[in-house]
Amino acid sequence: MKIIIAILIFSVLILFHELGHFLLAKACGVGVTEFALGMGPILVSWGKGETKYAIKALPFGGSCSMVGEDEDDPAPNAFGNKKAWQRFLVIVAGPVFNFLLAFICSLFFIGFGGVNKPVVYSVGEAASAGIQRGDIVRSINGKKITLGREIPLYLFSHPLDGSAEIVVERGGELLTKTVNTHREGWRMGISYMADESGCTLSQISAQSAAESAGLKAGDILVSIDGTKISTGKQLSEYFTAHPLDGSLIELVVKRGGEELSFRFLPSHYETEDLGFSAEYYYDDAAHLGFFGLVRYSAKEVVYWIRYTLMSLRMLISGQVGMKDLSGPVGIVDTIGQAVETGVENGGAGAAALNVLMLMILLNANLGLMNLLPIPALDGGRLLFILIEMVTRKRVPQKFEGLVHLIGFVLLMILMVFVLFNDVLRLFGK
């Protein structure tokens, strides 16, 4: 099922991209010889005027083949014989149409799923600075915030350093608060899940005090320092009354029917955070009105463009490695996970919203990548047209073709590498 959904998503993405090229080519008088969805052998084709329309066997890809696109052609409707601004519009239309599709998907995503307003829904240490539940975050250190998800994106590229100036809206009034962001304390390095069977350790953090002591995921908590623990409430109450202070602690757990005792020192930590949460609050879009819906939909697209730019910056700076890149196989797996998670948490409607969010991300990603000056992609061709428009001298077509050929070969090598990564990642699961 996830493969079918992924094929449909890829098909819509590429069809819209190529449709942009197609419509602007027709508008600028460029002859289109073939407009196809997919690659490889033709399954179905039909003709209308000068254009052959086709559906091909492989669902990944698509094409809008124009007269004189890659070679000299004396025909007046050849792509190469059109003015530079006309060629620019034809090429840039593909990425622009991806942004347009991302915007359309955002309208549905926000209309049915709600708007991700930066409303404070949980307050920790920031309460001492006057931050309250229900406050709407308007800016952090002067950076305007419109969506809740913009907060972690901002913090990733602007690390906190002791304090932060937060502007919040409360009852229609803007208030400026300065919060202390430095946190330090003690932790064991465990996560737990509480159910009928008790408090089960669900995760042990790598290189944590708990891991060094020998605790394992799946252990069932019996007691802490002699106090019996059988529910999540009891555990929370215990740490409220006895916060970790670096002293020796004893945990008794049940593993395989046997009770085991572990004594260890919690580890000290220092970190920075805002002391409140406002990232994942969703408000009903019904009160937004038409222009509000359009505004927030545009912000959603801008958010994913910025997210893609940040990911590229991380790749270039070495914060993430080439092994973290994903291709079609990895995207299919991600789509499958999004559908499964949605069905488990909220049924078909939640799954559809997850798919819509992925559509927004993928369209923003495809649109942006095709605007970058990468040979063989739209951005590379746009660069040569811009050079021509500035210098008023056209770059020799043979030289441009050679540059695009080299770029295409390098992209194919990258695709093979990414495919190999995807397969290794899948088998690694």
Which residues fall in each region the model found?
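Small-residue-rich helix-interface/hinge motifs
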Residues: 2-75, 369-391
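Alpha-helical transmembrane segments of multi-pass membrane proteins
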Residues: 10-14, 65, 98, 102, ...
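Internal alpha-helical transmembrane segments
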Residues: 27, 51, 58-122, 413
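Alpha-helical transmembrane signal-anchor/signal-peptide segments
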Residues: 28-29, 33, 113-132, 429
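Functional transmembrane alpha-helices
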Residues: 81-82, 187-208, 212, 220, ...
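PDZ/PDZ-like peptide-tail recognition elements
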Residues: 86-122, 152-157, 162-205, 250-252, ...
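Conserved PDZ fold ligand-binding element
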Residues: 128-148, 210-233, 301
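Final/C-terminal transmembrane alpha-helix of multipass membrane proteins
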Residues: 402-422
